[in-house]
Amino acid sequence: MIKFIAAMCAGLALISSLAHADDAAVRVERISVDSPALAGNPEGNSARRDVIVVLPPSYASSPARRYPVVYALHGYGITPEKWFAMDKQDQIAARAFRNGVREMILVFPDTYTRHHGSMYSTSATTGDWEAFITRDLVGYIDAHYRTIANRASRGLMGHSMGGYGTVRLGMKYPGTYSSLYAMSACCLAAREITPEQGRQIEAVKTMEQASAAPFMVRTTLTAAAAWSPNPNKPPFYVDLPYEGGQLRPHVLAEWAANAPLAMLPQYVNHLRQYQAIAIDVGNRDSLVDDDRALHEALDRFGIANTFEVYDGDHGSGVVSRFETKVLPFFSRHLQF
C-alpha cells in the first residue's frame, strides 16, 4: 500500500503550434484525438483526448522523410501539459537531437480521468484506455504524420503510472511496439487494503468528497475504477475491497490479476518478441524492490532486458534520464 501511494505521488485534430525559426529546434503541436474506445463510459471521461506531438527539427524541411514514433505515458495526477510545464520535454528532445540522438516523433497522450488517472487499463467504468493508446491514437498518428508505420519503428515509455502502462500494454500488445522503457513503474505487485483503509474509503459517498479525500482514498478509487468496475453501481461505478466493513476477496483478486508481476507468466511469449526492454528506478524510490522483482522475473524467463538503479528518488531522475537514457535507447533500438 505504501509503495502504491508513493508511486501514484482517432478523430478531429485541433492544432496549435509553437514553431521556431531555428531549423535545429523541434516543433510542438497540440491536437485532439477522438477515441471510439472511450465513448460513452459511465465515469464521464471525454472521448476527445488532448495530445502533444513533438516533431523533430528536419520534419518541415524534409517532406519525403518518415520517422519512428515514441509514445510517452504520463503518471498519476498530471496531464501532458503539466508534465511539459515541469520537465520541458520539447527542450530535452531538441538537446538530445543536437547531441546525436536520431530524429523521431514523440507523442504524449492525456489519460487524466475523473479519478486522476486511467491506469492505462480497459474498464467498463472509465473506458477502454488500452484501445485508445494502442489502436485509436496509433492509427491517428500514422494517418496524420509521416511515421514509419510498423511495430519495429514504434516505442513505448512512461514514468510511474506511465511506467505501469508501459509494462501492461507492452505485455499485451507486442504487435504494436518493438521497444519498451519503464521508468519507476508503479503498481507492479498486488495491492492490500487494511480494515481501517477500507472504512475510510467506504465513508466517501460523492465525487466532491472523493476529490477532497486523502491521497490513499483517491488512489484506491482510481484502482477500483480501472480494475474492479461496476457500471451498475453509481456514483463511482466500482466494486470496493470492503463493503459494510467486510473484506471482499474477489475484488482484491481482480486487482491482483492486473498486477504485472502476476500477469507476466501469461505473456512470456509476447515479451520475447521485443527488440529491447529497459527498466530504471531510483535507489531511494519505494518502488525499487518491485521494479527489481520485474527485472528478475524477466531474467527467469530468459527475456532480455536492462535494469538500472540510479541515485535518486521517485521523480529526481526523470528529466536528466529522459535526455541521456530514454531517447538514446530508442535511437539505438527503433528501426529508422
Residue ranges and their predicted role:
Residues 1-4:
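Positively charged n-region of N-terminal signal peptides that target proteins for export
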Residues 6-16:
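Bacterial N-terminal signal peptides
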